[in-house]
């Protein structure tokens, strides 16, 4: 065998001679404030509607059925009639889904079964 010279590597450590002044918060307050400002602007741009909904008072949406609560049902022969609607001053015929007047044999007996001898309001019928 041949004589092969051995080579040994020794680690060399170089000590840093500069300080990490970029990481100091005190010297770069304006940069930090600018970043915070940019973050708030981005939050406002992307979440503007959510922020408006959070800080604005909730609007009360009127229930369309509230206008019908004062209307009452009555029978005229075998026809079911509605009176007391806010937009109609006269008594009108109650209509079914297919827009035909509701005609029921023993209509008065049906209304008595709902509310006894008291007048039957639309609210009584809608709650059932």
UniProtKB/Swiss-Prot annotation:
How does it get modified after it is made?
Most cysteines are linked by disulfide bonds. They are created by the viral disulfide bond formation pathway, a poxvirus-specific redox pathway that operates on the cytoplasmic side of the MV membranes.
Q: How does it sit in the membrane?
A: Single-pass type III membrane protein
Pfam families cross-referenced by the UniProt entry: Pox_L5
Query: Which UniProt key words apply to this protein?
Result: Disulfide bond, Fusion of virus membrane with host cell membrane, Fusion of virus membrane with host membrane, Late protein, Membrane, Signal-anchor, Transmembrane, Transmembrane helix, Viral envelope protein, Viral penetration into host cytoplasm, Virion, Virus entry into host cell
Looking at the keywords, is ATP-binding present? no
Which chain regions cross the lipid bilayer?
31-51
Biological process according to GO: fusion of virus membrane with host plasma membrane; symbiont entry into host cell
Q: Which InterPro entries match?
A: Poxvirus_L5
UniProt KW Transmembrane keyword:
yes
Localization, per the record, is: Virion membrane
Its GO CC terms?
Answer: membrane; viral envelope; virion membrane
Judging by the UniProt lineage, the source's domain of life is Viruses
Which residues face the membrane's Intravirion side? Answer: 1-30
Record text on subunit structure and interactions: Interacts with OPG086. Component of the entry fusion complex (EFC) composed of OPG053, OPG076, OPG086, OPG094, OPG095, OPG099, OPG107, OPG143, OPG104J5, OPG147 and OPG155. Except for OPG095 and OPG053, each of the EFC proteins is required for assembly or stability of the complex.
Similarity comment: Belongs to the orthopoxvirus OPG099 family.
Function description: Component of the entry fusion complex (EFC), which consists of 11 proteins. During cell infection, this complex mediates entry of the virion core into the host cytoplasm by a two-step mechanism consisting of lipid mixing of the viral and cellular membranes and subsequent pore formation.
Protein name from the UniProt record: Entry-fusion complex protein OPG094
Protein source organism: Monkeypox virus
Q: Point out the gene that encodes the protein.
A: OPG099
């Amino acid at each position: 065998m041949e004589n092969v010279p051995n080579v040994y590597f020794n680690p060399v450590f170089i000590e840093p001679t500069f300080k990490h002044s970029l990481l100091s918060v005190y010297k770069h307050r304006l940069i930090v404030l600018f970043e915070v400002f940019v973050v708030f602007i981005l939050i406002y741009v992307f979440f503007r509607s959510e922020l408006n909904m959070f800080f604005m008072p909730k609007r009360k949406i009127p229930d369309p059925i509230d206008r019908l609560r004062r209307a009452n049902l009555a029978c005229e022969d075998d026809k079911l009639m509605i009176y007391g609607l806010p937009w109609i001053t006269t008594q009108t015929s109650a209509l079914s889904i297919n827009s035909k007047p509701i005609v029921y044999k023993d209509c008065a007996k049906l209304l008595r079964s709902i509310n006894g001898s008291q007048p039957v309001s639309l609210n009584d019928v809608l709650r059932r």
